[in-house]
Amino acid sequence: MSRYDEIYARAHNEPELFWEEAAESIHWYKRWDKVLDRSNPPFYRWFPGGTVNTCYNALDCHIDEKGHGDRLALIYDSPVTNKLQRFTYAELRQEVSLFAGALSKLGVEKGDRVLIYMPMIPQTIVAMLASARLGAIHSVVFGGFAAPELATRIDDATPKVIVAGSCGIEPGRIIQYKPLLDTAIDLADHKPQKCVILQREEQRAELIPGRDVDWGEAVASANAHECVPIASTDPVYILYTSGTTGVPKGIVRDSA
């Protein structure tokens, strides 16, 4: 039997023991009361009673517990913009903790939703991890989605804050995100309290006073924020289906 087959068989035959051992490799603020709660099928709950933070396990533990702060955590290599950026764990945590502080200053708390409408750039990862750092629930929507599709997801997720890029860049063209976002908010019944806009040098956007906040300015006035422990059964993100066969369905992912 190969190592893969052995691991697969064990996960299949002894799932609770298998995942209990796997859970030992991540950081817990409080250990779970039991591995799997089967009391309300088909709504099973993993590691009830435990508290955890996804951002801590993605970043902080590599620095504080393993001493890997100077190791590479993220490489951004864009053939479209010809930009190459590298972030160590320590550098990425600095970016994330400051943006978490900016979101907190805008009122984002544990359990709030943050919708992210951005291209595939480092700041998208920063926004995701910053939301998780606060115990907020993020939802990434494909950058450049048409306004009606974006509006549907805004109404479903009801975000307190939307984080968006001013534009996306594809071979031979620039797609302005901000007009799409503005139209989507007009179409949606739910209105976010604030929109944080990352102004990209290729195409800056016009900000709406009182609602829109410049990413750079928000971070410049923010203080770094620590991780917020949340229940292992609390959501960490919502990922929507394509909606090609009907209304998009939000898939909720628990923290553990």
Give short role names for the model-derived ranges:
Residues 1-86, 91-94, 98, 185, ...:
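N-lobe entry segment of adenylate-forming
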Residues 16, 97-101, 155, 246:
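Solvent-exposed alpha-helix faces
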Residues 55, 74-129, 146, 150, ...:
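Conserved AMP-binding/adenylate-forming core of the ANL superfamily
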Residues 70-72, 195-198, 208-240, 247, ...:
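Conserved pre-ATP/AMP-binding loop-to-beta segment of ANL
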Residues 77, 119, 165-167, 198-200, ...:
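Cofactor-binding loop segments of dinucleotide-utilizing enzymes, especially the Rossmann-like FAD-
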Residues 114, 131, 235, 241-244:
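Conserved S/T- and glycine-rich ATP-binding loop of Class I adenylate-forming
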Residues 133-217:
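Structural core segment of the AMP-binding/adenylate-forming
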